[in-house]
């Protein structure tokens, strides 16, 4: 698994996820977002938390896929699949802290993706960005996220 910067090819995933009204109660989203809005966001984000005051990364999962259905699994190549996104937001450079949030695609839930993504983001945030604190604000109804963050030591 890896975290990477958003690319224009991620627009279909972001459009689907941001407009999933069932998730709005667990986020600050109150209205649908257009493809144009999301395209502008992708075009304007620098990937620099100091400039944007937030950092959104795409969660990619590596998987082996056969080159040809006739070939054995020995002849395979590594492919990636987008399975979610994870954010640092409400960045406070002076106090070196930020909030964390994530979205895991329904087909990837319950497989440890969220926990692994949080660990990767923490490693980057504490090791490279030198943050002192990452905090999570979670809806009481979002038991899946509450469970992940509790396992990771968030209280």
Feature annotation, model-predicted:
Residues 1-2, 6-11, 18-20, 80-155:
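Acyl-donor (CoA/ACP) binding surface of acyl/acetyltransferases
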Residues 1, 16-33, 48:
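Helix-loop element at the rim of GNAT/NAT acetyltransferase active sites that forms part
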Residues 14-19, 38-42:
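Hydrophobic alpha-helical core bundles mediating ligand binding, dimerization, or RNAP-core interactions
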Residues 29, 39-44, 49, 114, ...:
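Alpha-helix boundary/capping detector
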Residues 33-68, 72-109:
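Acetyl-CoA-dependent GNAT
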Residues 28, 52-56, 132:
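Short, polar/charged, Gly/Pro-enriched helix-capping and turn/loop motifs at alpha-helix termini
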Residues 1-12, 24-25, 69-75:
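Conserved N-terminal entry element of GNAT/NAT acetyltransferase domains
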């Amino acid at each position: 698994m890896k975290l990477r910067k958003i690319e224009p090819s991620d627009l279909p995933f972001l459009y689907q996820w941001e407009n999933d009204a069932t998730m709005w109660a667990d986020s600050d989203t109150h209205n649908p977002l257009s493809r144009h809005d999301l395209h502008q966001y992708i075009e304007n984000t620098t990937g620099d938390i100091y400039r944007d005051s937030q950092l959104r990364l795409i969660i990619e999962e590596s998987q082996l896929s056969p080159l040809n259905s006739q070939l054995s699994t020995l002849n395979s190549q590594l492919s990636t699949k987008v399975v979610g996104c994870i954010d640092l937001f409400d960045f406070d450079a002076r106090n070196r802290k930020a909030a964390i949030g994530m979205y895991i695609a329904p087909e990837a839930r319950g497989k440890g993706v969220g926990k692994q993504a949080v660990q990767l983001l923490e490693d980057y945030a504490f090791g490279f960005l030198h943050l002192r604190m990452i905090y999570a604000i979670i809806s009481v109804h979002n038991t899946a996220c509450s469970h992940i963050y509790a396992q990771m030591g968030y209280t």
